[in-house]
Amino acid sequence: MVNDLDVYVATSMRNKQDFIEMANTCEKIFKDPKIKDFHLRYFDPTISAAFGHEDKGIIECLMVRCTKVLIYSAGIKESYGKDAEAAMALSTGKPVIFYCMDSTKADFYKKVHPLTKLIDFSTGVANGAMVTFQVQEVVELLRRIFYNLMEYKLEQPKKGYFRLVEVSTDSAVRVQTNDELLTKSFWNYFDRFVKE
């Protein structure tokens, strides 16, 4: 059954209000008419339970591994758990949507934070998160992902430096650097590591 998971919602909830807000957010996303007919199977973090924190961690890692898309719900406070879940999804090449409460935090993740783009361990390609602060944009991204209607543009801010940018969120989802030393060092090590 876990291999049927479409969307994993990564979040951290510390108090009753956090649980209520997360439940409302999940309802707004997954009951939206644009995607309701998909009958997406998603992990609702407000009803998660396990016998202990070790079991909970193992279950959640398995769900992240099996899901098709991960939504990272950036709350007021950050937590290691949801950061690790987003990192696992990015490092396995999955689409990751960062949903932020406000545009300031969204801009931080989109334009400043270096780890919203991580290397896909199987290909060596940089995989970046799509970042938004609007629930409707999360819904639209899910619709486009599952209908295979994603739209991208290729940017070249400097000679030899390329960014593949998701159009609606203006988020870089793939990056190629023009730093020759970094490129050669990376691929020499990565290729050797993969062959071992």
Where are these regions (language model features)?
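Conserved catalytic or regulatory cores that recognize and/or transform ribose-phosphate-containing ligands
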Residues: 1-196
